[in-house]
């Protein structure tokens, strides 16, 4: 459906008398993307002018298709899959993580950074083909997992953040607190990733996050060789990306509407269970360091549980897409926003 030039040079429209007429489209009304190949960030408005980064050159469509085929075939071979065999879940995860990363060996210096920025539609080049595939996969999974084929947006946050950070008494405390919150954020996102896939998380983008890479390698069993060129594999110093607090304390995900509450409650349980396990391990190590028997000392464990009671707080909200429905279901037009307006009224002080 994509066309580098739109509208077309001619367009057929019905006249007042009902007859179809063919009209010429003037040049100023046409979008000729190849003459000004600029990619625009949908949020910041930042522009990436391809003409200033080597420009555009003719590339055979068949050549791109072949390189794409070889790239994804290579990922399947790395998983040990041949002729349709293998773990489909692993294949999805490998495609999601490494699909946008075309190696120089496979690229032959032709596409370079443009591979990651290829627009989904040159008529509106404000998002890449990978963004399009991420959203398509996320919604397809949510639709398929819901008995009514309905998706919902789930927004979830953990906290409180400021009091937790304010309790720090040194720079190392600040680093440890930020790192712990980032890890808690991942533990909150992990149940969603395990149930629906990491593509279901719309914000933050998880692709390339070192903590997520570790999960893909160690828990989802993607081959270590796929991560050989990742920055977090290159050194063990403090500058390793694994030591960075890379995740915020909130996320937005596309989930099956009927499972939104269940998923949110599962997230809350997972986060508090993980933190409690860490607390028990800390107490055990402290007791061992003090020369006490970790198995026969009850008071420190009880104190730790009391200190962590109710932490972290988990707040969430879910909005089903059914709040907006088309009145014309055949053509999917004439949207009815009454239910959405009613749901949003309290937030805008509307009676």
Describe the residue ranges of each PLM region.
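Regulatory and interdomain segments flanking nucleotide-handling catalytic cores
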Residues: 1-351
């Amino acid at each position: 459906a994509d066309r580098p030039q739109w509208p077309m040079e001619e367009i057929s429209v019905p006249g007042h008398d009902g007859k179809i007429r063919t009209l010429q489209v003037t040049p100023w009304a046409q979008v000729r993307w190849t003459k000004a190949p600029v990619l625009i960030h949908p949020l910041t408005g930042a522009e990436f002018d391809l003409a200033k980064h080597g420009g555009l050159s003719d590339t055979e469509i068949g050549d791109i298709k072949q390189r794409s085929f070889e790239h994804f075939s290579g990922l399947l071979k790395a998983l040990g899959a041949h002729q349709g065999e293998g773990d489909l879940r692993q294949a999805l995860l490998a495609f999601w993580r490494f699909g946008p990363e075309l190696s120089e060996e496979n690229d032959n210096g032709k596409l370079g950074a443009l591979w990651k920025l290829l627009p989904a539609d040159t008529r509106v080049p404000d998002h890449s083909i990978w963004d399009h595939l991420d959203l398509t996969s996320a919604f397809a999974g949510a639709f398929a997992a819901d008995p009514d084929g309905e998706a919902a947006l789930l927004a979830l946050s953990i906290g409180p953040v400021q009091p937790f950070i304010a309790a720090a008494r040194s720079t190392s405390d600040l680093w440890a607190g930020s790192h712990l919150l980032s890890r808690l954020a991942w533990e909150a996102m992990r149940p969603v990733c395990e149930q629906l896939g990491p593509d279901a998380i719309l914000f933050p983008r998880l692709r390339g996050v070192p903590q997520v890479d570790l999960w893909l390698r160690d828990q989802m069993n993607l081959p270590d060789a796929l991560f050989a060129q990742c920055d977090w594999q290159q050194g063990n110093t403090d500058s390793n990306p694994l030591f960075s607090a890379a995740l915020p304390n909130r996320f937005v995900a596309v989930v099956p509407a009927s499972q939104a509450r269940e998923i949110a409650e599962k997230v809350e349980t997972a986060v508090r269970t993980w933190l409690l396990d860490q607390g028990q391990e800390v107490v055990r190590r402290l007791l061992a360091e003090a020369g006490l028997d970790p198995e026969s000392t009850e008071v420190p464990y009880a104190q730790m549980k009391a200190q962590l009671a109710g932490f972290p707080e988990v707040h969430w909200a879910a909005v089903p897409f059914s709040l907006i429905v088309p009145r014309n279901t055949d053509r999917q037009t004439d949207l009815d926003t009454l239910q959405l307006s009613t749901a949003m009224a309290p937030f805008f002080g509307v009676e």
